[in-house]
Design a protein with these regions (language model features):
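Calcium-binding acidic motifs and repeat modules
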Residues: 1-69, 75-193
């Protein structure tokens, strides 16, 4: 009787595993397409639909709160607007990086293909976007400015132990990739400040 119970449990485990593999293999291409299609908008940069402050709710889950559904965690979005109320260029590059990091934290399917797609298409592009608003005439100043901008977002986005653990696990899935040829989702040269 015990032997039959073990066989039934193993059979259930195998069936559940096969169903999961089928689900992931069927849905991964759609998820990768969604990753490639997700872009920052001018409305995001200009604060057209700013969310309210989520308060303590922001840190209760890895994903946090995105009430305005723009792909950027609300507390991070509000921090960027608070710090840079008069610089649309800086907001644009920081929001794009926040969007990329949030995509990493909210993937419904986490596997090598989706993790690599987010880093290759969105994170590498967002970092290049951050670099685009700093002059390279003084490389020490360039490095300091770009590090400051990158860390401003990263320190707010990856700000709990659960988020740090999640990101550590996320990067285990990233395969080799080439850096995106694209830069910013928004043409920052059209922004006055």
């Amino acid at each position: 009787l015990l032997w039959k119970g073990v066989v039934v449990l193993v059979a259930i485990f195998v069936i559940v595993t096969l169903l999961r593999v089928l689900y992931v293999s069927k849905n991964t291409p759609a998820q990768v397409a969604k990753i490639h299609a997700t872009k920052l908008t001018m409305d995001d940069v200009m604060g057209v639909n700013l969310p309210s402050d989520p308060g303590a709710e922001a840190d209760k889950t890895v994903a946090g709160i995105d009430a305005n559904k723009n792909g950027i965690r609300d507390d991070v979005e509000l921090a960027i607007f608070k710090e840079y109320p008069n610089s649309a260029k800086t907001r644009a590059v920081l929001l794009q990086y926040a969007l990329a990091l949030q995509m990493e934290m909210t993937l419904p399917i986490l596997n090598r293909e989706t993790a690599t797609a987010v880093v290759e298409d969105n994170q590498s592009k967002a970092l290049k976007c951050i670099w685009s608003i700093s002059s390279r005439s003084d490389m020490d100043k360039f490095t300091a400015e770009t590090d400051k901008n990158e860390n401003f977002v990263k320190d707010r986005q990856i700000n709990t132990e659960d988020r740090k653990k999640y990101m550590h696990n996320f990067y285990k899935y990233v395969g080799s990739y080439s850096v995106s040829d694209d830069w910013c989702d928004i043409d920052v040269s059209v922004l006055k400040n």
